[in-house]
């Protein structure tokens, strides 16, 4: 085996290890990453500023200004606390400390049919009410959640939610949050975010 071929083979194996083909791997290496630092552990998230530029820029603005400092994971949605929902999902949701900082104006909804991103295990996405109402609240998926994509029925308008990245480390922490004590869907107590900081 020639040296050049060995190098190519090693690159292919590395791509398989990450679940990315070489082109996607190079693209991934260019994307911003942040670390969500919480009182119970860290979650490293890759932000897809290429496919969801508006949503990514909005999230990173809150990060860069330190607005998520002392925020909280406050909601868990799991099998045992959504008895009246026909469409079930599994996520944890977080946001700012509303007594410390205020939201910027809402942003346009970047639909998954346009971005090509899907709500897979570890996807980070923006919480919203109606279309074009997302501000700072975000959630992380536990397991694949196609009901949150465009055309899904978790929100009756069928527009889905704006996925904009994925957790690359710390899903064990996310799952811990999902199973933490809750009153209905509200975590009791909420889990404090120490800060969210850029890694690259």
Question: Could you say what each language-model-derived stretch is?
Answer:
Residues 4-19:
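Bacterial N-terminal signal peptides
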Residues 19-200:
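Cyclophilin-like peptidyl-prolyl cis-trans isomerases
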């Amino acid at each position: 085996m020639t040296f050049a071929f060995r190098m190519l083979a090693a690159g292919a194996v590395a791509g398989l290890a990450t679940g990315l083909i070489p082109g996607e791997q190079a693209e991934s290496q260019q994307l911003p990453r942040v670390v969500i630092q919480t009182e119970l552990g860290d979650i490293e998230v890759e932000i897809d500023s290429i496919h969801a530029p508006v949503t990514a820029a909005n999230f990173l603005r809150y990060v860069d200004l330190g607005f998520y400092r002392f925020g909280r994971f406050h909601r868990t949605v799991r099998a045992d606390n959504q008895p009246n929902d026909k469409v079930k999902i599994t996520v944890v949701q977080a946001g700012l400390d509303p007594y410390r900082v205020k939201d910027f104006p809402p942003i346009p909804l970047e639909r998954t049919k346009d971005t090509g991103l899907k709500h897979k295990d570890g996807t980070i996405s923006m919480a919203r009410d109606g279309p074009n109402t997302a501000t700072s609240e975000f959630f992380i998926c536990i397991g694949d959640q196609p009901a949150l994509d465009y055309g899904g029925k978790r929100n009756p308008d069928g527009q889905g939610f704006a996925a904009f990245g994925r957790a690359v480390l710390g899903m064990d922490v996310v799952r811990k949050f999902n199973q933490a004590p809750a009153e209905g869907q509200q975590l009791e107590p909420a889990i404090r975010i120490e800060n969210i900081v850029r890694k690259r």
